[in-house]
C-alpha cells in the first residue's frame, strides 16, 4: 500500500511538472519537480547521476544476465551469444527513439504477462493440494518461533526487512521516481489518471506476478533438492518444466526473456533522460549502455547487485525527500477513488 501511494505521488508530480523542450520532447521526472517544485537543482543533479548509474547496473547488466541465464538453461545458448543478441535487439529498438520504445513495450509486455499468468495458474491447478502447505510455510517462515527467538533475532529480522524492501523496490520501482519518468511522455492525459495507472502497475507486479511466482516455486519444489539448488531464472524455468514439460518451460522462458528485454529498453530511456538533465555523456551513452548489456550476460553480478542496492537507495532518498516536501501539491480527485 505504501508503494502504491508513493507511485501515485511521484507519477502525479512527474506529469504535473513536465514540459517540452525546444525539440518538442517531453522532459519529466523527479529531476524536474526537484528543480521546478522545490527549486533545488543540486538535488536534481544528484538524483540524475544515480539514475544514470542504475541504468548501467540493474537496468542493463542485471536484466541481461537474467535473460542470458534463461537462454542458456532452456536452449543451451552460450551466455556470450545470448547477451550479444540481446544487445543487438536493444540497439535496434533504441535507434527508433521513445516512440519505438513505447511500441515495443505496448506489444511485448501484455503478451508476456498473459502467458506467464496463464501457465502459472495451470501449474497451481496441478498442484492445488500443495497450496495450503505453501501458505503455511510462508507464514511459518515469517512469524514462526524460530524466527523471533535467539540472540541473532534482531539481526535476522533487520536483514530480512532490508532484502525484502530492496528486492521489492527492484521489482516494482515504487519510490525510485522512475515511474514519473516513464509516465511523463503520455499524451492526452492528466496527472491523476497516470497516477492511478502507476498504482495499478505496482499492485499487478508485486501482488499478482511475484505472488504467483512464489507459489509456483513453493508448490513444485517440495522435497526436490535438485531444483532448489538452482537460482534465478533457471529455478523458475525448472519449476514450470516439472509440471508442464518442455512446452511450459519454453513459454515461460520466452516470457522471462521478454520481461528482461522490456526492462532493458525502459531503463535505456530512463538513463537517457538522466544524462540529458546532467548534460553529460549524451553522445557515448548508447555505447556505454549496450556495452553494459553485453557484459551483463558474461560476468558474475554479486558486486553489481550490491552497488545497485546502494544506488537504488540513494535515488529513493532524494526522490522520497522531494515527495515529502511536495505532498501538499498531490491531489486525489474523488472520481478516481
Describe every region a protein language model picked out.
Residues 1, 11, 15-55, 73-76, ...:
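Transmembrane-helix boundary/entry motifs in multi-pass membrane transporters
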Amino acid at each position: 500500500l505504501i508503494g502504491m501511494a508513493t507511485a501515485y505521488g511521484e507519477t502525479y508530480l512527474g506529469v504535473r511538472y513536465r514540459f517540452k523542450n525546444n525539440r518538442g520532447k517531453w522532459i519529466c521526472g523527479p529531476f524536474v519537480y526537484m528543480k521546478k517544485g522545490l527549486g533545488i537543482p543540486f538535488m536534481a543533479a544528484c538524483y540524475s547521476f544515480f539514475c544514470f548509474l542504475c541504468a548501467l547496473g540493474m537496468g542493463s547488466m542485471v536484466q541481461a544476465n537474467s535473460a542470458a541465464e534463461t537462454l542458456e538453461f532452456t536452449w543451451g545458448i552460450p551466455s556470450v551469444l545470448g547477451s550479444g543478441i540481446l544487445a543487438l535487439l536493444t540497439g535496434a529498438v533504441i535507434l527508433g527513439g521513445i516512440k519505438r520504445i513505447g511500441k515495443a513495450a505496448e506489444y511485448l509486455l501484455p503478451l508476456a504477462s498473459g502467458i506467464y499468468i496463464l501457465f502459472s495458474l495451470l501449474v497451481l491447478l496441478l498442484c492445488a493440494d500443495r497450496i495450503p502447505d505453501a501458505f503455511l510455510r510462508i507464514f511459518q517462515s515469517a512469524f514462526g518461533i524460530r524466527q523471533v527467538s535467539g540472540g541473532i533475532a534482531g539481526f535476522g529480522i533487520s536483514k530480512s526487512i532490508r532484502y525484502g524492501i530492496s528486492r521489492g523496490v527492484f521489482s516494482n520501482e515504487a519510490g525510485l521516481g522512475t515511474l514519473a519518468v516513464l509516465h511523463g511522455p503520455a499524451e492526452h492525459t492528466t496527472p491523476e489518471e497516470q497516477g492511478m495507472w502507476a498504482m495499478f502497475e505496482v499492485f499487478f507486479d508485486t501482488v499478482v506476478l511475484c505472488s504467483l511466482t512464489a507459489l509456483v516455486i513453493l508448490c513444485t519444489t517440495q522435497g526436490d533438492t535438485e531444483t532448489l539448488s538452482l537460482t534465478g531464472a533457471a529455478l523458475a524455468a525448472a519449476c514450470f518444466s516439472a509440471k508442464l514439460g518442455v512446452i511450459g518451460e519454453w513459454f515461460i522462458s520466452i516470457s522471462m526473456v521478454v520481461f528482461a528485454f522490456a526492462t532493458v529498453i525502459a531503463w535505456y530511456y530512463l538513463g537517457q533522460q538522466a544524462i540529458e538533465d546532467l548534460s553529460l555523456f549524451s553522445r557515448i551513452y548508447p555505447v556505454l549502455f549496450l556495452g553494459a548489456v553485453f557484459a551483463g550476460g558474461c560476468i558474475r553480478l554479486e558486486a553489481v547487485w550490491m552497488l545497485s542496492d546502494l544506488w537504488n537507495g540513494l535515488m529513493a532518498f532524494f526522490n522520497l525527500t522531494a515527495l515529502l516536501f511536495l505532498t501538499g501539491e498531490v491531489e486525489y480527485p474523488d472520481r478516481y477513488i
